[in-house]
């Protein structure tokens, strides 16, 4: 068992934390806004650890679902299931165990949060299969990656206001932006194996579509900032996030594989900048 631990860690991408961070930033945004900048330490621990656990479970299910495709993609041909080092049932069992651990974490929380966790589990588990029939599966991914937003509001306020769903919508557009950059890396392989991605759906308009999605995301956060009366520190964070989006354009405009991958990874800074602006605004109100 312990000898196989490195394989399991590779399966759930513990060596690639970017995915967990892309889930965590919008969840932290929601925790801070829902609590007026004062989330409790237990909630921070629950949502942070839960985010990592569910992202790990999602990776295991994704590799199980894509096991017959990954062998034909340069970037994924050596993943543990595809290479035969881990059996398919092991990935499913690991995903189930991680999901159970995540559910145990939220047992102290209210009933609404638990109910939303069931919906979150369904969306996360079904996402990998949408690549077979949905033209823009990245939009579905945005719902899966953003479900921590309504759950955070539910845990703190015991209801989910419209603001939470607006923030989730922003996350959908952001996810389409960064995961289209990711899909541009595998475009040629995805054409051969016949799966659907936003990079293929957008075609020659892929760069324009990505920048439009960034614009919508940032535009929604303009509305949030105005609605909540955020101050200068928030707008500095917003401006830094907008700068990141502009920088991504310089990386993806020529559609070079590694530059597109670099743009995808750099979204950690975009998400971090938005959160820093939100956290800084609330911190300034304490004094």
From Swiss-Prot:
Subcellular location field: Cell inner membrane
Broad class of the protein's primary localization: membrane
Pathway: Cofactor biosynthesis; ubiquinone biosynthesis
Molecular-function annotations in GO: 4-hydroxybenzoate polyprenyltransferase activity
The EC number(s) this enzyme carries: 2.5.1.39
Segments traversing the membrane: 41-61, 92-112, 133-153, 160-180, 218-238, 267-287
Record key words, sorted: Cell inner membrane, Cell membrane, Magnesium, Membrane, Transferase, Transmembrane, Transmembrane helix, Ubiquinone biosynthesis
Enzymatic reactions: all-trans-octaprenyl diphosphate + 4-hydroxybenzoate = 4-hydroxy-3-(all-trans-octaprenyl)benzoate + diphosphate
Highest rank taxon of the organism: Bacteria
GO cellular component: plasma membrane
PROSITE patterns recorded: UBIA (PS00943)
Bilayer topology annotation: Multi-pass membrane protein
One Pfam family cited in the UniProt record for this chain: UbiA
Gene3D superfamilies given in the database record: UbiA prenyltransferase (1.20.120.1780)
InterPro entries, sorted: HB_polyprenyltransferase-like, Prenyltransferase, UbiA_prenyltransferase, UbiA_prenylTrfase_CS, UbiA_sf
Listed GO biological process terms: ubiquinone biosynthetic process
Cofactor(s) of this protein: Mg(2+)
HAMAP family found in the cross-reference section: UbiA
Function as written in the Swiss-Prot or TrEMBL entry: Catalyzes the prenylation of para-hydroxybenzoate (PHB) with an all-trans polyprenyl group. Mediates the second step in the final reaction sequence of ubiquinone-8 (UQ-8) biosynthesis, which is the condensation of the polyisoprenoid side chain with PHB, generating the first membrane-bound Q intermediate 3-octaprenyl-4-hydroxybenzoate.
Family: Belongs to the UbiA prenyltransferase family.
Protein name (database record): 4-hydroxybenzoate octaprenyltransferase
